[in-house]
Design a protein with these regions (language model features):
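Structural motif
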Residues: 30, 79-80, 115
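Short, low-complexity N-terminal intrinsically disordered segments enriched in polar/charged residues
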Residues: 1-28, 32, 139-140
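A solvent-exposed, acidic/Ser-Thr-rich amphipathic alpha-helical stretch
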Residues: 5, 23-75, 88
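Short beta-strand edge/turn micro-motifs at domain boundaries
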Residues: 103-138
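A short hydrophobic beta-strand element
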Residues: 81-92
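Short, cysteine-centered beta-strand-loop-beta hairpins and adjacent loop/turn segments enriched
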Residues: 92-103
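Short, surface-exposed coil-to-beta transition loops
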Residues: 69-71, 87, 102-109
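Short beta-strand segments enriched in hydrophobic/aromatic residues
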Residues: 30, 90-92, 125-127
Length: 140
């Protein structure tokens, strides 16, 4: 089953929530527990412990000049009737201390549970270590 419009609308919400730090919207987008994976490994995350961390994450990004994040494209791969995998391509804009604007392209992969009114993130995969990715792009 292809969920094109449902996925598009969901990720418009992900983009909005990320740019505005809308914790209520973020709360509605994640399962109560989800798996987070990055180059250092995987871990099960309790959503209620994750949400209080997000303002600190936003402060980190602001400290390196983050202006906005946009989703440039989505690639959906249905798994079955209940789950779909979505690779999201993000374009992040930063303003360096010099005033120069720069962009960083980052990807994330999500496994979404599709039952119910709105999808829920049950797994979030970051292929790069975030701090290293920022260093590699000259932002740290």
């Amino acid at each position: 089953m292809n969920y094109d419009n449902k996925i598009k609308m969901f990720f418009e919400g992900v983009e909005k929530a990320g740019n505005t730090l809308d914790l209520n919207l973020i709360d509605s987008q994640f399962a109560d527990q989800f798996i987070f994976a990055d180059p250092s490994g995987t871990r099960v995350v309790e959503k209620q412990k994750f949400l209080p961390f997000l303002p600190k994450r936003q402060e980190f990004f602001k400290s390196i000049g983050h202006q906005s994040t946009k989703i440039s494209s989505l690639e959906e791969t249905p798994i079955d009737d209940q789950y779909t995998m979505v690779k999201a391509h993000f374009l992040m804009q930063f303003q360096k201390a010099s005033g120069e604007l720069t962009e960083a392209k980052l990807d994330s992969t999500y496994i979404l549970f599709m039952k119910g009114d709105t999808p829920r993130i049950v797994m979030h995969i970051e292929p790069e270590d975030l701090q290293q990715a920022m260093k590699d792009r000259g932002l740290l």
